[in-house]
Design a protein with these regions (language model features):
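Glycine- and charge-enriched low-complexity intrinsically disordered segments
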Residues: 69-80
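Mid-protein regulatory/catalytic core that forms ligand/cofactor-binding pockets
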Residues: 1-71
Length: 80
């Protein structure tokens, strides 16, 4: 199994967040956004859409969260 980037998860598939890389901590406001959105290590979610600009929409506890390409390429997840 192993991990992959959030952007590699197929629409309709579920995942568990494994790691938020340090690189994202240096983006102003991004870490707070991820924490408020429950996109934190150990949390489960499901990819519901991927837009042409690379934004990945995920369902976290019933809430739709749009994750930009920069973050979705770097957040590591595992399939559930």
């Amino acid at each position: 199994e192993g991990t992959s980037s959030l952007c590699e998860v197929v629409v309709g598939d579920s995942f568990t967040v494994e790691r938020i890389p340090e690189e994202l901590e240096f983006q102003p406001g991004l870490l707070e956004f991820l924490e408020e959105s429950n996109l934190i290590p150990g949390a489960n979610g499901k990819v519901t859409a991927v837009s042409p600009d690379g934004t990945t929409t995920v369902d976290m506890k019933g809430e739709a969260i749009g994750v930009g390409a920069f973050a979705s390429q770097r957040i590591l997840v595992s399939a559930t």
